[in-house]
C-alpha cells in the first residue's frame, strides 16, 4: 500500500501517461508494449494496469531477449508475468544466436544491431504491430530529447528526425499507412527522479539489481562490470572483487556499468538521485561506441 498520496506533479504526469495509453488503445488496431524489465518498464506497466482497470491492458507485452540480460532480470520478468497473468512475448534473434553473436568477440555495436535492433524489427513485422509503447524519457539522452511522444516509423521501422509531426496541446497524429508504425513514449516528460519517486509512492516492484548489494565486479575502462555468469572472459591478471554496488540502468550485463552505492531502500535511492550529477546512461557502454550512436541506432529501428 502506498505510504503517501501522490504529489500534484506526479498526478499530472500519471494522468498524461494514462491519457496517451488510452489514445493508443482507441486509435490503433494492434498495439504492443515493449517491456525491457527495467524501472521505466515497471512504471509503464503499472500505469497501463491503472489506465485500463479493472480490465487487463488491451495489448500484449513484447520483450527482446539479447541472451545477455542479467539473470535476475529474466527471473523477475517471468515472475511478473505469472503474478499478473500477462502475456509477455519473447523475441530472440535465433540466427544471431546460431552465429554466436556476442559483445565480447563482436563488439557492442554489432551485438546490439543483431540481437536487439534486428530482433525488435522482426517482432514488429511478424506480429504486425502498428504502435509500440516504449519507456524512453527525454531527460535520458540528446536524441531522445528531440523525439516526439508519437514517433513515426517507416516501413523499415526506421526513425527520421527530420520527418516528425507537430504535437500541439496534447493532440497526436495517429494516421499511418499500411506497414508503417508509431513508437509511443508515455514517459517522455518524466525525469529519472520522477520515476523513482513514483516507484516509491506507488510501491512498484523492481528488479533487485537496482538496490545496493555486494556483487562480483571487474573494473574495465572506468566501468564496474558485474560477473553475472561464466561467459564473461577474464583478462590476464583480472580477478572479480566484491563491491557494494547497484545499477541505475539495466541492459546486457557485459555492457552495463554498476555504481558504488549503499542505497538499499527506495527512500535511499531517491535521496541519492537528489544529488546525482551524472546521467543514468553513463553506465551504458552501447551509448559510447561511436559519436551520435543512439540516434544512429534509432534510425535503424532501435527502441
UniProtKB/Swiss-Prot annotation:
Enzyme class at the top of the EC tree: transferase
Catalytic activity: sulfate + ATP + H(+) = adenosine 5'-phosphosulfate + diphosphate
Any Gene Ontology biological process: sulfate assimilation
Gene3D superfamilies: HUPs (3.40.50.620)
Renumbered residue ranges of the record's region Disordered: 282-303
GO molecular function: ATP binding; sulfate adenylyltransferase (ATP) activity
InterPro entries: PAPS_reduct_dom, Rossmann-like_a/b/a_fold, SO4_adenylTrfase_ssu, Sulfate_adenylyltrnsfr_sub2
EC number: 2.7.7.4
Recorded metabolic or biological pathway in which this protein acts: Sulfur metabolism; hydrogen sulfide biosynthesis; sulfite from sulfate: step 1/3
Keywords of this entry: ATP-binding, Nucleotide-binding, Nucleotidyltransferase, Transferase
Family per similarity comment: Belongs to the PAPS reductase family. CysD subfamily.
Function: With CysN forms the ATP sulfurylase (ATPS) that catalyzes the adenylation of sulfate producing adenosine 5'-phosphosulfate (APS) and diphosphate, the first enzymatic step in sulfur assimilation pathway. APS synthesis involves the formation of a high-energy phosphoric-sulfuric acid anhydride bond driven by GTP hydrolysis by CysN coupled to ATP hydrolysis by CysD.
Quaternary data: Heterodimer composed of CysD, the smaller subunit, and CysN.
Name this polypeptide is given: Sulfate adenylyltransferase subunit 2
Highest classification ranks of the organism: Bacteria, Pseudomonadati, Pseudomonadota, Alphaproteobacteria, Maricaulales
